[in-house]
């Protein structure tokens, strides 16, 4: 995380409920580092799609609309000027591609979920694939172009996705094409 805090403005946006986030934060940032995050958003700042996950039918799909971040929908929690962040300089990282259904395609990456213990998993390490990818992101002015040219993790959900017929219903529900 130090690598990220040194190079980026970092926020945490979880689809978990607010009262469950503190334990996750301690694991991710280390004890006492919450203040280094520009914002911490929970399920309340997500959009409830009204649909459920294909893999876990009891789990609702919550969407993370980057427009809410860029437009400062929740201004009290965002310490920057309106318009300072946009599609060109924002990257959403989430293990669930469906959270980004309403965002521009190349505005997010979706690493595989971490499965412990796996001593051969170096994805998050100092020489890992994510670190290398983020080093590239830190050097560019146009994040979506970099994401498009340097695919990493799971593919985004687009019309070529095998489950598109299901996810298309969510997209249309919110008036996107």
Predicted segments — roles?
Residues 1-27, 43:
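Substrate-recognition element of Asp-dependent hydrolases with the DxDx(T/V) motif
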Residues 22-177:
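C-terminal cap/substrate-recognition subdomain and adjoining C-terminal extension
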């Amino acid at each position: 995380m130090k690598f990220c805090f040194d190079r980026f403005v970092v926020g945490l946006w979880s689809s978990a409920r607010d009262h469950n986030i503190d334990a996750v934060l301690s694991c991710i940032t280390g004890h006492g580092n919450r203040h280094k995050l520009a914002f911490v958003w929970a399920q309340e700042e997500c959009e409830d799609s009204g649909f459920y996950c294909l893999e876990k039918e009891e789990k609702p799909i919550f969407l993370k609309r980057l427009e809410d971040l860029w437009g400062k929908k929740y201004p009290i929690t965002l310490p920057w000027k309106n318009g300072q962040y946009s599609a060109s300089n924002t990257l959403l990282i989430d293990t669930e591609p469906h959270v980004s259904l309403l965002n521009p395609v190349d505005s997010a990456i979706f690493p595989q979920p971490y499965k412990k213990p796996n001593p051969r998993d170096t994805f998050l390490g100092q020489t890992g694939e994510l670190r290398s990818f983020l080093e590239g992101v830190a050097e560019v002015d146009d994040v979506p172009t970099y994401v498009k040219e340097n695919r990493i993790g799971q593919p985004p959900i687009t019309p070529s996705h095998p489950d598109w017929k299901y996810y298309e219903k969510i997209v249309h529900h919110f008036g996107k094409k």
